[in-house]
Amino acid sequence: MSSKLKYTDIDVPLDWLYKGKRRNRTKSAASTRTSEATTTSVKKTATLPSTAAVPTKTIASPQRPLSGQNVNNELSNSKPAVSAEKVSQQGQVPTRRTRSHSVSYGLLQKKNNNDDTTDSPKISRIRTAQDQPVKETKSSTLAEPIVSKKGRSRSSSISTSLNERSKKSLFGSLFGRRPSTTPSHVVERPLSSQNDHKKSTELPPIDTRQSKISTPTSTPTTASSKPSSSGGNRHSDGSLTSKLLSIPHNILETSSTNFNAHHHIQSHHSSGREQDSPHSESSDLPPILEKETTQKQLQKVSKVNLKRVTIAVQEFNSDPPQQLPSRKPKRGNVLIPEDMISAPPLISLGITNSSDQSSFQSNISPSYSKDSKEYKLALENFKKAAKEAEKHQKDAYYVAERMAQEVANYKARQLKTSPLTGATNSAADSATDQESSSLDARASKLHIDKPINVGAHPFETHQDDNIKYSSHLEQTLDVAYTRCCHLREILPIPSTLRQVKGKTAPLQTLKFLNPKPTLVDILSFCDFIAITPIHNIIFDNVSLTHDMFKIVICSLVTSPVVEKLGLRNVVINEQSWKLLCKFLLQNKTLIKLDISQTKARTDLNDSNYRDQMDWELFCEVLRNREGRPLEELLLNGLRFDKMSFSHFKNILLTFAQMNPKNPIRLGMANVEFSTECFDFLFNWMSEYNVQGVDLAYNNLESLAKRMIKKLARLPYKHLEYFTLNSTNITSVDDMSYILKYLSRLPSIKFLDLSNLPQLFPGILTSGYKYFPQFPQLKRIHFDFDDLSIKETTMLVSILAKCETLSHVSLIGQSPMPDASKISDSTDEPDKSKDEKKEQIVFMRNTLWASLYAFVRDSHNLVSLDVDYDQVPDEIQSRIALCLMHNMKRIMDSSFKLDELTVQDDLIFDGSLITETAEEVLKRLNDKSLLQNDVGKKYLLKKYFEKMEKVHHNVQNTIDSMFEKRKSGELPLQEKENLLRLLLLEKNLSNILDIFASMPNIADVVPFSKADNSFPNIGDSTVSANYNDGIRPSLKHLDSDRLINDVSIPENDSSIRPHLMATDSGRIIDVTTGKALLFKSSSNTSLAGKRQEEEEGELHKWGVFVQHQSSRHNSGLPSSANSSRISGSLTPDSSVAGGKKGESSRTSGTRPKILPKIPTGAELRDAIIKAKGIDSVDDLIKNVTSEKVGLESLYGDELNSRSPSNDSLQESQQKAPLQRPLVEDETVTKKYDKLLNDLSNVRHSKT
């Protein structure tokens, strides 16, 4: 059974749920982006010759319709619009309002997405280039750097001043720094400028709050149209920028961009009608794309190349030689002037400038400029050194040329002077060639000994070589990762090395924990993951450039086992998005994708936000993807309110329809969506096989009513996860309805109610009703709900009714009050301080006892998350032991606890109850503490139920242990536990008697089922026998059993020695005239009280005899002991026989069978009459004060028990090894004697 058991059968996995801090959702700090018209960035269009013929509507319209267009239309129709012609007639340029906001040129080509609270007037037209004079004013000149910053539509960092932007040089940004990885938008400016004058009135309205200045537009950037003003340089720079930047970044672009733009243009006029009626489309099917559109979408990634060379680490038998460079190399003595004024080269990115690297944009300004004194001095020295080096180089060249000429002349002169010598030399050369050819023939037959260093290991054998190579084939992953790093000549990253230390492939999860890696770190890490089978790869919160992102994607695209890729908060631009889509299209094993964006850098462009990505391409890739479909898609942190509803709908439908068989999970935590998206989300959850949707950290206070309606009307058969963590639901009634309808769902396994302190303790009443009704609830969280001790105790008592729970989390509650800190305050009197201390200690002990009881009684519970630093060590160990037993019980159905463990747990439970009984009694006497507190009444009632249950279990355990003792199967340790249980049972009986004798117990804790002031006990897990106050039939009868089962006649003088009379409502004794302690309606029996007094006297005498016997330091002989035990075990033996000693002296004879066993008062009278005393106290007094020996009472039995010292020493010398056995026998005999007496007392009650 254990081999087939899965983790999901025991607990609920939560690795896909979002865990983070709640963000402050104020309007001013909702995001680093502005929430007005600057929500989306302009898509880059291809610069083709045919683009000039495209109408202006194609350029100016947005690529996707925005969800807030109907709101913008209503606002623009309700308020007057200011035309651009009036502005041009006035001849004025709008002045900017602040330095932090600007309008980029790309925004003029898109319709703005305004919020519902927009109250600023709209203008229907933007000032164009024809409206501007030829000579620009100063204000328009200042506006130019804002438009052309890095060639992008707008900057997300709104804190940069205009003066800083105007000082930047375009050529310096091109050659002095690294070009941006994101596509530039400067190429759009000439296109729009050529067509702005044709249909300028068709431009969409913009918000005047965003249009701080008017953006002048230039004419097409040609050589013949350069203006004479300062703006001319700007245009020429822009043209050069478009030529330079369009080459490396347009490789992956195709003409499909124009088609997409045209496709959205066609639906632009009908977007208003679609927004007015959002459900006009079919909600069952995704938007149908034509076949040509599908091909165009896939063409965007057709040219994306994901090939990458991997390293065969297995081929390297040893590490390569290393020469590891320093990460912070020192600057050498030779200084090149260009290094002083230029940025670090790309090869040094992240290595030489790792300490100063704040981002990967290479925006580090040089330390010197061309006008600095140091640069001029270094340049002058460099020129001098260059001239001197050139001079030396020429001199060396001349010397070498002269030497070569002299050598040539010498050879020619030798040949002319001696012709015979030349013939001789030629003959010698031919002979030498023949000899060399013969030597080559012989050398070809020779072989070099392998290995070359065979002499280095003279004692190595072939067997050792085989062992070496076989161990190499099974190398661990840390060796492989270290070798990958050494091949890149770097040291391994410690955070990664710790994760793979001593592990072999395949690896379950690997996280890249370096938030700011260098390029060589990514290269070595990707070399490792490309050759190692890893199921989950996590890159959360890692700053990756586009090149790094491409390396990661290329290394994983051919992985046959990768199942999850985590890219949370990783910057993804347009190029990287296409790489991701191509990866999804080619990889066949990925089923879990995390592209959440819960936080972003302050300098991040709007085009790099997830809501601005090409989601149509993403959906098309999911439709055409081969292999396993996605089962888990995490979109946490996305701004769905900035996306069109059609895109949101298309994503969800595509994700669900591509995987109809397997359950799917969607992450929607910490997002922003409209009510329309929220309604569609819950409809989508009910129609498809949705296992869970993470809604944590969303403000659902205004959407709670909609949620209740959806849960009440729609079926959610497959829903297993429901998270309400940090959802800001404040209404207790709304949460009660949510719990009501969630309890009706058949498959809910996980419920998260964390970070909702405003609902407690009001929600506990509904929780008491609905939590036990969940059919399959396995895990529930109440983290950081600020629960007090009393509320936590009540919650634990409620959760004890949920039989299917396996994991409960109660982390981060209100801090426990410390009793020691109360003494520091001197304002209160000492009495009140002591009372508060006692109350705090009582509350803490009650909570620990409740937690322990909850764990012990919940047999399916395997994990309890609480703040254990405040829990006592003993309780911690008990809880851990119970959880371990529960786990064993789940894994093995035949597992059972041994008898010693059960007895120890029972004794511990009883001790916890008896320790708190005194404090409970004090609070029962004080009616003000419990008069109006329903919670305290409920806890008190649970306390009584618990006491009754423990008392019942103790009695059953005692009966079973006595049965084992009769058959001789009770070991010594269980005999000790039996004695403890007998004392515990007596203590619990006394406590119950005290509580039952209280006259106001019925007022404080109404036991009638008609009382609804707090939850009914009839719903508890305790059996109905406890609810009615009647205990099951037991062999051992206590005082409460006598109350209910024994009928006492009214005229029995032996039971009622005094006559009773009532006087003015008071019950008094006629003989004494004093008021009685109990009312006539009390359940306490006088017969029971008298029997307890007799039992106490016998117990007192037995303890006294045991104490006196222990002073003799003797053991009972085996013969006497056996006869005594045999006599005591027979039920027909006399009860007083153990004290008189006749049974020991006549052990050989058969015990006398009495016709009737004396019990109760007869037994007491018989003992007193035999000893000639009036009470047991007098008997003890005679023995202690009057020196009456026990020999006179028990005869010669004690003399036979105490051997002489000589015999004791001889026995010790003869058998020193038998001493432990003798001691064990002595202890066993003592326990047997005491248990015999207590057994006889128990029999006397029956």
From Swiss-Prot:
Miscellaneous comment text of the record: Present with 195 molecules/cell in log phase SD medium.
Residue positions where Phosphoserine is found in the record: 102, 277, 1013, 1200, 1204, 1207
UniProt name for this protein: HMG2-induced ER-remodeling protein 1
Keyword annotations: Cytoplasm, Phosphoprotein
Subunit structure of this chain's protein: May interact with ribosomes.
Positions with biased composition (Low complexity): 27-41, 154-163, 211-230
Family: Belongs to the GIP3/HER1 family.
Organism: Saccharomyces cerevisiae (strain ATCC 204508 / S288c) (Baker's yeast)
Entry-linked InterPro entries: LRR_dom_sf (IPR032675)
Entry-annotated residues carrying Phosphothreonine: 128, 1130
Function description: Required for HMG2-induced endoplasmic reticulum-remodeling.
GN (gene name): HER1
